Amino acid sequence: MAKIAVLGYGTVGSGVVEILDANAESISKKAGQPIEVKSVLDLRDFPGDPIQEKIVHDIDLVINDDEIDVVVEVMGGVEPAFTFVKRALEAGKSVCTSNKALVAAHGAELLAMAKERSLNFMFEASVGGGIPIIRPLNQALTADEITKITGIMNGTTNYILTKMSNDGSSYEEVLKEAQALGYAERNPEADVEGYDACRKIAILTSLADGRTVNFEEITTEGITKISNEDFAYARKLNSVIKLLATSYRKDGKVYAITAPFLIDTTHPLYNVNGVLNGIYVNGNMVGDVMFFGAGAGKLPTASAVVGDIIDCVKHKGTNVCLIWDDEKLELAPTRDEVRSFFVRVKGNTSDTAMVKEQFGDVEIITVDGLDNEFGFITDKMTEEAFDKAAANVDMISRIRIDDTKLQ
């Protein structure tokens, strides 16, 4: 029998315990032996919960327990998670985690520690919740050079943008609703400012390339400035606005960005709505591959964690190699990226001379009820060229356009 410890008995931790109990028979067959939760580390007690007899409050009771083979870190945050995970690996225990902040900050180091000790550090649930994406990149798609990854990787922001698009509600209204439903945290900054999705694309890009991407160097913009007026133009253009986390390789350089994008009905992520996530991957041989499903939530995320636990038990004493080392991947500057932009400017449609002087003979777009402003879509240009031209017009807002198409 394999024995594990769970660090954190919150949403995901309790889900892990629930799945191991509910699916015990099938999990035992897949792992080759039964899996038992021996200890659960938490600051709290849980009187009346069957798990109470396994609750411990001291990490040393986990680290020093030679019976524990696998440690499951589902506490979140970088510390003390990083310290606890390092200690677990040093003590000869494999580790599974759903913690994208930990993986984005220390993934390469922890993978190296695990490899040196013939252990495993697994993190399928850190990106996409229940959507399998880490394993496909590391196993099924290893014959390919990955040329592009773009995804809706945050359910909170996708829910907010979907409701704004469909119902015409304001950002502030939908955020309050999302918080009431449990889709958004009391402090939603990590989600709505794009930081959560940024960390996830950093992890995927690091795995796809094999070198470490510093998530702090990825251009990141959130959704807090997206307005109902922006969606009015989007509807006029048969498009929607999505927070996309994207990286791609072009001319030997790797670019990465997390920001709101305007996408039309031909885009592979157009119909990914609500709290669902979708991730598009292009490989130079396989072509286009799509991953779609629940990107968060208790049981979907816990399911991915339990999948990692099973892998750790099956491969005890053997490292399942993930190619991601600590060599830094230098990202190309965002200013050099080439794309089109949707732009809203103040003014009357009878006076578009300055816009056309700066951006060429663009088509002017108007929306009924929105007075003293108009919109247009630029030709493809670098971000640097756009910023220089936009400085000469009375711009209200701009949204990048992603024109990814399934091949």
Regions found by a protein language model. Give the residues of each.
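Structural motif
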Residues: 7, 73-75, 98, 105, ...
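A conserved regulatory-domain signal marking ACT and ACT-like small-molecule sensing domains
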Residues: 309-407
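Substrate-binding/catalytic subdomain of NAD(P)-dependent oxidoreductase enzymes
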Residues: 175-271, 276-278
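N-terminal glycine-/serine-/threonine-rich beta1-alpha1-beta2 phosphate-ribose binding loop
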Residues: 1-90
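Catalytic, metal-anchored helix/loop core of enzyme active sites in primary metabolism
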Residues: 146-150, 158-161, 165, 177, ...
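Rossmann-like NAD(P)H-binding beta-loop-alpha module
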Residues: 68, 115-196, 203
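Rossmann-fold NAD(P)-binding glycine/threonine-rich loop
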Residues: 81-87, 91, 100-138
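A short hydrophobic/small-residue beta-strand
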Residues: 94-96
